[in-house]
Amino acid sequence: DGTLWQSRIMVGRPYRSTPMLRSEINRLTFNPTWTVPPTILREDMLPMIRKDPDYLTREDIEVISLSGAPLDPRQIDWWHPGNLLLRQRAGPHNALGRVAIRFPNRHDVYLHDTPAQGLFNLDRRAISSGCIRVANALELARLLLDDEKKWNQAAIDELVASGLTREVALARRVPLILYYWTVAVDAEGVVSFRPDIYQRDAAVLAALNRPLAAAAPSH
């Protein structure tokens, strides 16, 4: 019982909200690559590529076909790119940082590290595209692996330093709940109120105030 570990996080912007869900964490990816999701490709990446021909090189992003074959970005009409994928190579500037923490879900979201650690100092951190960025993510990874002989901090640091991408399955899945609460009570009974960043409180309040349906007559 009680809190074993806690950390600051960043969640999705209001127009790319982090979903509510239940799942189980089942694997970790150290030194992950990042395949850019279609929405981010269309709304964020393409405008930047059109403005700056060096953007892909600077961000260490490769262009590949749907089958995984490399494509030459100089040969692509970025106003009509067709079917392709952008994949950011593993490394210190990768958007997922040094580890991604994965669990089955239909939204294709996950927890992950980030190279932009300074953003955790912001008071309002609804700035991601739906996934959850976690401060001290490598520490969380060590706790999830729960194997101090094989996966102590030194072993994790060595793997990260190698730069090699590696998938590690958890010996025991860890339950995960993503919820959205704008009111919370801490262990001392202190109530705190948070901004309703996704504008959901009005619908919840309306549902709570709705009269209960009349009970069906018994026979």
Range-by-range predicted roles:
Residues 1-219:
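Well-ordered beta-sheet/strand-loop patches within structured domains
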